[in-house]
Amino acid sequence: EPLSVFIDPVFLSTLPTRELLSGFAEVIKHALIADKSYWELILNSHPLGNADWEPIIQKSVAIKQSIVEADPTEKGFRKVLNFGHTIGHAVESLSLEGGRTPLTHGESVAIGMICESYLSERKRKMNKEELSSISTLITSLYEHRVFEDMDTHRLIELMKNDKKNKDDSISFTLLDGIG
């Protein structure tokens, strides 16, 4: 564990738009997994506008820190931090294959969050309005990607290799709702 962490939001102004959005995917994830009121703030804080980054960063750091401190060995609740990552890692890996345009980690996780939100709704854990809200925000921020039918099989192969899986089944992090 680090002794301290230094964060200066001023450096965000030096990032290309694509990298800023990549990092913002983790902010979205923190709101979705932990705090509905934070989600409402995120809905009104477009990352390319004049967002006040300091409270956003403080809230995301506090959420992640509280989860990690509550479950330092990732035996239980900390797994919620994997939301969007099972599918996201597979999408990111696929984007690096065969001359495709590589996706950033955040772009891939954003796709994964939409997919895992859809799975959450299908399992009757999340309502349709929340799924729609998540989908609308993410698709408004991130470039649309189209996957071919043949990619589905490759994505499943890649998901099967995920370190979080147990007993040859793919593990997803599903949400009961926003926050």
Show where each model-derived region lies:
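C-terminal charged capping/lid subdomain of soluble metabolic enzymes
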Residues: 25-27, 125-179
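Short glycine/serine- and small hydrophobic-enriched flexible loop segments
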Residues: 93, 114-122
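Oxyanion-binding "anion nests"
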Residues: 45-99
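Small-residue-rich helix-loop
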Residues: 107-115
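Short alpha-helical scaffolding segments that buttress acidic/His motifs in well-ordered protein cores
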Residues: 24-28, 56-67, 81, 113, ...
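A glycine/threonine-rich phosphate-anchoring loop and its flanking beta-alpha core
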Residues: 1-44
